[in-house]
Amino acid sequence: MSIAASQDTSAARGALASARRGASRVAFAAALACAALSSLVVSPAQAAPIDSLIKSVKFDDVDGVNKLLAKGMDPNSVDNQGIPLLVLAAREKSDKVGAALVANPKTNIEIQDKAGENAMMMAALNGDIDFVNLLIAKDAEVNKKGWAPLHYAAANGHDDIVKVLLDHSAYVDAGSPNGTTPLMMAARGGHVSTVKLLLDNGADLTVKNQIGMTALDFAKTYKEPDVVEGLTARLQQMQQK
């Protein structure tokens, strides 16, 4: 990943983390409690193979991963931070390993990390359309309850992924636990083309989250004048009809 891409992704993750904090702590805790995370209990004898497996995932070493899986390693294993291999592959843009894991019949493609993030969400955030398409081809859920892949793609302005998700019936006004929509995330990030794409696909710019903020409010709060101008123009068009 380039430095610029890494900075963009970090900024988007920061925006998502901040938006998450706006949700009710009780509701968010409940959502996490309901998230199914298949974790592997690692014995000391298995520690080295697990470390090797995780390293192979990070470096997109598909041969290394396949060898360890052939020896009986669980494709739903997690690292020491509770991140499942498939989610880790999506975070690291390890597409070859991702394809191998998805092809494994034992892999849970909806598996989540401790924050409730799955591989589709991470691939959407990173702009990895190949990984997104790989998951969609395996019938991965595009309409995850709460924070959804569309929020993550919109947060970083990945229009190609936004379009793919919408083409596969992603709900354009998906609400996070605190009612934040993909349009709000795109507006917050100043992604003009993403805002337009979402609006053209039916996003409701009048929706408010739990603290009463609309997409326009987000754009104003985070000082995104181009988005403010565009959303204001859309509102005026609506009022004239």
Where are these regions (language model features)?
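Ankyrin repeat domain, specifically the short helix-to-loop turn at the C-terminus of the second helix
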Residues: 66-74, 99-108, 133-141, 163-171, ...
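Ankyrin repeat boundary signal
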Residues: 77-78, 109-112, 141-145, 172-175, ...
